[in-house]
Amino acid sequence: MNKESLFESINKLSDYECINPYSSVVDLEYNETESYWKSGNIQELYSISRSGRGETDHQKVPFCGGIIIFQKQALEKLSGWNEEFWGWGAEDDFQSIKVRNFLNHLQVKDKCYHLWHIRGNIDRDLYFRNLHLYNHYINMQKEGLSEHIEKTKDLVGDFDKIKKMVK
């Protein structure tokens, strides 16, 4: 992403509680990533003109996926990130729902460049568990989400929170 755009986004935190400094993700290919690592020339990335995820296809980029900037008190207002999600999947989607419902937020029109890397194996059982949990939360009304946030606020920073959440 363009560093000037990132700094502009950070400077807008006085007006917004949460900012996503990009709206699409360009997934770099192996050779593009390797070339960037060798040259260190960020302009090479900026010269890539293809569309990113979410621009011309059905893929969505979660508001809270990847780079996300919060005011500290805004993150506290949301009770942080929901730690009921384990492994990979859906935690950023749920955080996005909380942001859209409870915070003054901004999504900047810019591209983010995702370096190519080997993808790890996803634990499908945990992934489907996360989807089940996510479906539970997306079916809540705003009042139910608010109650959930209030209920979990005292668990932020508590190392024994998982034990308390399953009781």
How should these model regions be labeled?
Residues 56-57, 62-63, 72-73, 77, ...:
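C-terminal catalytic/acceptor-binding lobe
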